[in-house]
């Protein structure tokens, strides 16, 4: 696509020819088979691109191709390469390796990557691959030294857990119970990881040809995240929270310079709030980083900053941009940076000069959250200033696209088509953008309507309101397999960004600060009314569902209205008092989401808890949660289930063994969730 300076889109000749070629190739294949709606097990046929990394000296791009392993019920990843014009797409690693984190050497001769917990190298000229590490723990944040001789990475270093009690009298060879586990750490469990081992993440380097890793950091602190070498290769810049009270400051961090030879640390930033993701400019003179002054708000936009290489002259580049900076990379000439942020639900790349006005280049970044239409994408800058990124669409998961700027214009060419074989045989639900006014204060609320295949506006359809989690996240114009599967069953699906959502400015996101749920409920009901007013919805067949924060609003809604025939609450929070004392991030939630600790202000916690309104519920309700969810623990689901049982309300609980808060990490769970939701809704249709 070509994008003019006002952001309007027109098809380029390249894209048109690409689509015509794809159509001509697919016509014969479709001749003997009918196009049909998506099926539940199509989940296993989805693929998507992520982690694009362009070579420093050619048009070759390496990226991660993600796919679903039906036999192992896992999402797997392999490395592929493609030229910037879309030609020469080929596999770099085999499906036997679960590969990720590709990083080019500075001269473009090698690619380092992580596969099955070890660092591997791929030699471009010979095509040879080799494992170069034998680590006890998995590495992350691979970073090449400027001379290509070293690779830095972060890795967890376990520490022997202490136990103050030793039980006497155990005979040799006796089969006693497992010993008690003694815990005295504030951070003792995490969603997706379970109960944490004692230890911390540290920074290491190792020779690029393989060898013994050298530990560079020390102390009882975590050192992880993005790293960047100084131009002479003698120092590494990184971020960490090394304050003594770091456990009670869950988001604070500073930028440090680490002298590799002496191990000396120099702190370059100093403020109350996170400073992170340092990147040295190509000319070696400056460091860019992201951060924010912490005001203890539930949502705070991180801005882009630059400083001299010695930490002096810190200045903000995006103070006038009321959005959260999600990523950034230096332009090759060091005169500015390319930045990535969400605006009105859409992933946006802009060029931010060191001095002067920024220029928006595209708003089509995203596609990584293929399950539900959350924002989220990735990009990287090529040596000649072109940008490769994950391209978003409502009709398919993330593909790769390349953005160029010939003669002052902006052109975007999609260069992969990973899901063509599946999607040319499936009828995908059409998505339409809508805006409507909130009945609370007339604020404009943004949303999207997904129509079932074969939609006829003269007919009446059941409506599903699908609510995003967070609550400080955003939906957008992205492919969403779960919602598509609902639409494939004949439902119109509405999804919106009510107050509290991100990408509409910090003030809009914080309209629910210390006040959640509240008028976000009204924004959602206004969206339902706006769709009903279009004339194609059966008002007696309204349904509601949502996950995490969307589960909160689902259970809140049925405690405040009886308009829905049935509800499905996915991993909800029911009782804020019990939540903050059971969730893994309790030291964050109590400081940023609530005005006081629960025993100091129990009325506030209960006022905003769906359990306080369960006596009003008449709606049949399905509850669906992972048994290993440490973010919104299954005890929340159990509270609501038992309350509804005591009230005699038709209810069911679906428990997913071994599943964390991220239910869709196993493809079969991704398939099960919409299947159970549709089963429940069909049960209560007219």
Predicted regions and their residues:
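Beta-strand-rich domains and repeat architectures in extracellular enzymes and scaffolds
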Residues: 41-77
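Conserved beta-propeller blade repeats
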Residues: 46-61, 96-112, 136-154, 180, ...
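Structural motif
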Residues: 72-78, 118-120, 162-163, 200-202, ...
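Predominantly five- to eight-bladed beta-propeller fold
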Residues: 76-77, 156-204, 239, 249-253, ...
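Short loop/turn segments that connect beta-strands within beta-propeller blades
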Residues: 83-87, 123-127, 207-211, 259-263, ...
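Cap/lid segment of the alpha/beta-hydrolase catalytic domain
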Residues: 243-244, 409, 416-540, 547, ...
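Active-site-proximal cap/loop segments of hydrolase catalytic domains
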Residues: 495-686
């Amino acid at each position: 696509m070509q994008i003019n300076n006002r952001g309007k889109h027109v098809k380029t000749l390249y894209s048109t020819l690409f689509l015509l070629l794809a159509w001509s190739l697919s016509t014969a294949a479709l001749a003997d088979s009918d196009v049909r709606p998506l099926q539940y097990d199509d989940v296993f046929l989805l693929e998507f691109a992520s982690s694009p990394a362009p070579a420093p000296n050619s048009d070759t791009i390496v990226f991660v191709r993600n796919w679903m392993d039906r036999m192992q019920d896992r999402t797997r990843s392999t490395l592929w390469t493609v030229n910037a014009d879309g030609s020469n797409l080929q596999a770099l690693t085999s499906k036997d390796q679960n590969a990720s984190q590709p990083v080019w050497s500075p001269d473009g001769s090698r690619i380092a990557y992580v596969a099955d917990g070890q660092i591997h190298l791929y030699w471009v000229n010979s095509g040879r691959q080799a494992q170069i590490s034998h680590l006890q723990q998995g590495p992350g944040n691979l970073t090449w030294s400027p001379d290509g001789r070293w690779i830095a990475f972060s890795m967890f270093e376990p520490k022997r857990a202490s136990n103050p009690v030793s039980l006497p009298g155990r005979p040799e060879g006796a089969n006693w119970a497992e010993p008690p586990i003694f815990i005295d750490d504030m951070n003792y469990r995490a969603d997706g990881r379970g109960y944490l081992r004692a230890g911390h993440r540290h920074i290491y380097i190792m020779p690029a040809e393989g060898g013994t890793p050298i530990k560079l950091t020390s102390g009882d602190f975590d050192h992880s995240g993005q790293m960047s070498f100084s131009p002479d290769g003698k120092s590494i810049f990184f971020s960490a929270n090394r304050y003594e009270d770091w456990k009670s400051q869950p988001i604070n961090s500073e930028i440090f310079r680490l002298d590799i030879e002496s191990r000396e640390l120099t702190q370059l930033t100093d403020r109350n709030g996170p400073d992170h993701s340092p990147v040295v400019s190509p000319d070696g003179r400056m460091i860019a980083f992201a951060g924010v002054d912490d005001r203890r708000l539930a949502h705070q936009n991180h801005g882009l900053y630059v400083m001299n290489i010695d930490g002096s002259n810190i200045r903000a580049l995006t103070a006038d941009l009321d959005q959260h900076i999600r990523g950034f990379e230096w332009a090759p000439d060091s005169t500015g940076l390319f930045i990535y942020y969400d605006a009105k639900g859409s992933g946006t790349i802009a060029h931010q000069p060191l001095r002067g006005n920024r220029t928006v280049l595209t708003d089509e970044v995203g596609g990584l959250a293929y399950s539900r239409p959350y924002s989220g994408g990735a990009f990287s800058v090529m040596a000649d200033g072109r940008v490769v990124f994950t391209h978003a669409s409502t009709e398919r998961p993330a593909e790769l696209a390349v953005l160029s700027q010939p003669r002052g214009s902006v052109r975007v060419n999609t260069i992969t088509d990973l899901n063509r074989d599946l999607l040319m045989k499936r009828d995908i639900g059409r998505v339409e953008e809508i805006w409507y006014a909130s009945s609370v204060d007339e604020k404009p609320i943004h949303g999207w309507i997904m129509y079932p295949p074969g939609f006829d506006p003269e007919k009446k359809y059941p409506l599903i309101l699908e609510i995003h989690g967070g609550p400080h996240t955003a939906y957008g114009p992205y492919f969403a397999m779960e919602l598509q599967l609902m639409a494939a069953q004949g439902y119109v699906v509405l999804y919106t960004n009510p107050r509290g959502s991100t990408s509409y400015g910090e003030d809009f996101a914080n309209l629910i600060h210390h006040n959640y749920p509240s008028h976000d409920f009204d924004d959602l009901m206004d969206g339902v009314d706006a769709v009903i007013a279009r004339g194609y919805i059966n008002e007696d067949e309204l349904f509601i569902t949502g996950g995490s924060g969307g589960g909160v609003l689902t259970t809140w809604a049925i405690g405040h209205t009886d308009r829905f025939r049935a509800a499905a609450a996915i991993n909800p929070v029911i009782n804020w008092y019990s939540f903050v004392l059971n969730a893994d991030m309790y030291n964050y939630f109590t400081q940023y989401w609530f005005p006081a600790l629960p025993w100091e202000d129990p009325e506030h916690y209960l006022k905003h808890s769906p359990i306080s309104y369960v006596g009003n519920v008449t709606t049949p309700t399905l509850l669906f949660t992972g048994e290993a969810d440490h973010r919104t623990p299954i005890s929340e689901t159990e509270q609501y289930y038992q309350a509804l049982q005591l009230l005699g309300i038709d209810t069911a609980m679906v428990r997913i063994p071994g599943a964390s808060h991220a239910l869709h990490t196993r493809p079969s769970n991704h398939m099960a969730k919409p299947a159970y939701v549709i089963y429940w809704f069909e049960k209560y249709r007219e």
